A protein has these predicted regions:
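Auxiliary Fe-S-binding modules of radical SAM enzymes
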Residues: 2-20, 73, 190-262
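Canonical Radical SAM [4Fe-4S] cluster-binding loop centered on the CxxxCxxC motif
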Residues: 21-66
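Short hydrophobic-acidic sequence motifs that mark active-site Asp/Glu residues
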Residues: 24-26, 84, 144, 183
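Short, well-ordered amphipathic alpha-helices
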Residues: 27, 66-74, 102-109, 211
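Short strand->helix junction
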Residues: 34, 92-93
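Conserved alpha-helical substructure of the radical SAM core
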Residues: 48-84, 98-101
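Short glycine-rich or small-residue beta-strand-to-loop segments that form or flank ligand, phosphate
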Residues: 85-90
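Conserved AdoMet/S-adenosylmethionine-binding subsite of the radical SAM
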Residues: 95-237
């Protein structure tokens, strides 16, 4: 099977150039030798969960704060300037048991070294039922939550949640609790999975109910994107620029800002 091989250092990596966020200093709250995620997406650049089982532990709050401060200090001394500090990496950041405290530390260090930098969290939304996670996400500049579709069968086929209790309708209701302080991120792609199932979610069957959900959530922005790196399943294809632009314009007609990454 074709396998992606990107596993990020932990707890700090980069800075890297992000298509969506600019010069990004990464914060990885997962082990440096594997992947820990509540989704097992067929398009994940880090590969499948079962093939990336870590032996190391997650970094502690103290380890994250120390590594982040050291890196920010060096960047300041070297004249480097990050646009954004981004929680991403090898899995779901909000699952860290000290996530809220780590966000508090990050805000403090950002304000000390680069007060103009934004703090972003890339999340699959599976822990937003926790009040502490929601409090933390309200403190960051870019609360970026995944919503690839509202179709449960498509989610089961492509995002593959680890929990059988995952309910996209409940996720949408929880997203509404941010009262607009949320950016919705959606992957659009084409092709087939390894079982030959069509994974094209660019048509109206998927886009129309997704737009209805966006109207409910009322996000400050929507980010749509497509495959840019290697994927663990061989038959996945990029959505075209024209298709993404057409979806972007439909979002904008709702009065919601939308960016597309090709």
């Amino acid at each position: 099977m074709f396998m992606a091989t990107i596993i990020y250092p932990s707890p700090i990596f980069g800075p890297v150039h992000s298509r969506r966020l600019g010069t990004s200093l990464g914060i990885n709250l997962q082990p440096a030798d594997g992947k820990v995620c509540t989704f097992d997406c067929i398009y994940c650049e880090c590969g499948f969960n079962a093939d990336r089982i870590p032996a190391l532990r997650r970094p502690s709050r103290e380890q994250v704060a120390e590594a982040l401060e050291n890196r920010l200090r060096r960047m300041k001394e070297d004249g480097e300037r990050p646009d954004v500090l981004t929680f991403a990496g090898n899995g779901e950041p909000t699952g860290h048991p000290q996530f809220e405290e780590i966000i508090d530390d990050t805000v403090r260090l950002r304000d000390r070294y680069f007060p103009d930098a934004r703090i972003s969290v890339l999340s699959n939304s599976t822990f937003i039922h926790r009040e502490g996670v929601r409090r933390a996400l309200m403190k960051v500049d870019n609360n970026i939550l995944k919503l690839d579709t509202v179709d449960p069968e498509y989610i089961a086929m492509t995002d593959r949640p680890a929990s059988r209790s995952y309910d996209v309708r409940k996720i949408i209701e929880l997203m509404k609790l941010f009262h607009g302080h949320v950016i919705i991120q959606t992957m659009f792609m084409k092709g087939t999975d390894d079982n030959g199932n069509d994974v094209d979610n660019t048509g109206d069957r998927y886009v129309a109910p997704w737009l209805d959900a966006l109207e409910e959530i009322g996000p400050e922005e929507v980010m749509i994107y497509t495959i840019d790196r290697e994927t663990p399943e061989r038959g996945l294809l990029k959505a075209g620029k024209e298709e993404l632009d057409a979806i972007r314009m439909r979002v904008e007609r709702l009065g919601i800002e939308c960016t597309a990454s090709y």
